[in-house]
Structures are given as structure tokens and as C-alpha cells.
Design a protein with these regions (language model features):
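Short, solvent-exposed amphipathic alpha-helical segments in soluble enzyme
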Residues: 24-28, 87-90
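Hydrophobic/small residue at the entry helix of a nucleotide-binding pocket
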Residues: 16
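Conserved N-terminal Rossmann-fold NAD(P)-binding element of oxidoreductases
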Residues: 11-12
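Phosphate-bearing ligand-interacting subdomains
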Residues: 50-142
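NAD(P)-binding Rossmann-fold cofactor-contacting core
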Residues: 27-49
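HTH-adjacent hinge/linker in prokaryotic transcriptional regulators
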Residues: 1-7
Length: 144
């Protein structure tokens, strides 16, 4: 659970990756964010909220030398599959996938949680379109 201190890394320090690094409390949910990786030279060697950003080229070596339980994937979708294969081949147990590509793990022991912002937006659209009585009842249930 939430008190285990699972080791995690974040891959892709673009807008979404930076937002997660700076605003999401991984520790609260039982994850110790150990490192982040990116290809942009201006980011490499810097740190966000105490998490150092490493060159993406060093990821295989990092994975070989460190136990990583989970990875947060924020890379461009063109790199999603190859990055997932790299992670799973190095024994990463779980991937929190923000790439907008529906990923499945080549390793049956790896869990992939695909996050699709469009699903959340569709849910909102559905809720907005319900008539007022249904909306009021749903709001009462959801806001308890």
C-alpha cells in the first residue's frame, strides 16, 4: 500500500512531466521519486523539487544499477512502446502511462495503468448532458 515507499522514476520532463514533478505528492501515495529522465540538454543535470534530471541515454544503466518498482511515462507517443519495452526488460513492475498510447506490457508481470485525459473529459460531457434532477442526485452522491 501507501506506506511501502516504492521506488519510482519519471521519464519525459516536458510540460506534463514538470507539472507532475512540481505538483504531485508521490510520497503521499507510497512512491519515492528517485530520478527523472529527458533528452533536452537544458534540463539534464537540473532538479525539480529535489529530483535530479538525468540524460535519457543513461536510463538503461540506471535501471541496471537501481531497483525501480514503477515508472511514470510522459514521453512523446512516438517513444512510448520502445520506452515501455526498455522498462519491462529491466524489471520495472508498474508503469503509469500518460503518453496517450494504449500500452500493454510485453511482460505479463508488469502492470500498465493507461491514463487518458479524454476519458475524464468525456465523463464530464456526459454528466453535463444529464438532466438537472439526475445531475443533482449524482452531485449529492459524489460530494459526500
Amino acid at each position: 500500500g501507501m506506506d511501502r515507499g516504492y521506488s519510482a522514476i519519471l521519464i519525459g520532463v516536458g510540460n506534463l512531466g514538470q507539472a507532475l514533478l512540481c505538483n504531485f505528492s508521490f510520497k503521499t501515495w507510497g512512491f519515492e521519486l528517485k530520478a527523472a529522465f529527458d533528452i533536452k540538454p537544458q534540463l539534464i543535470g537540473t532538479d525539480y523539487e529535489g529530483v535530479k534530471i538525468h540524460d535519457m541515454a543513461t536510463l538503461p544503466q540506471y535501471l541496471s544499477e537501481n531497483k525501480v518498482d514503477a515508472a511514470v511515462l510522459c514521453v512523446p507517443k512516438t517513444h512510448a512502446v520502445e520506452t515501455t519495452e526498455l522498462l519491462t526488460s529491466h524489471g520495472v513492475n508498474a508503469i503509469w502511462n500518460f503518453t496517450n498510447v494504449e500500452l500493454t506490457s510485453p511482460e505479463s508481470s508488469t502492470i500498465v495503468e493507461n491514463i487518458h485525459f479524454s476519458d475524464s473529459l468525456l465523463s464530464l460531457s456526459y454528466y453535463i448532458s444529464e438532466d438537472n434532477d439526475e445531475k443533482a442526485a449524482r452531485a449529492a452522491r459524489m460530494n459526500k
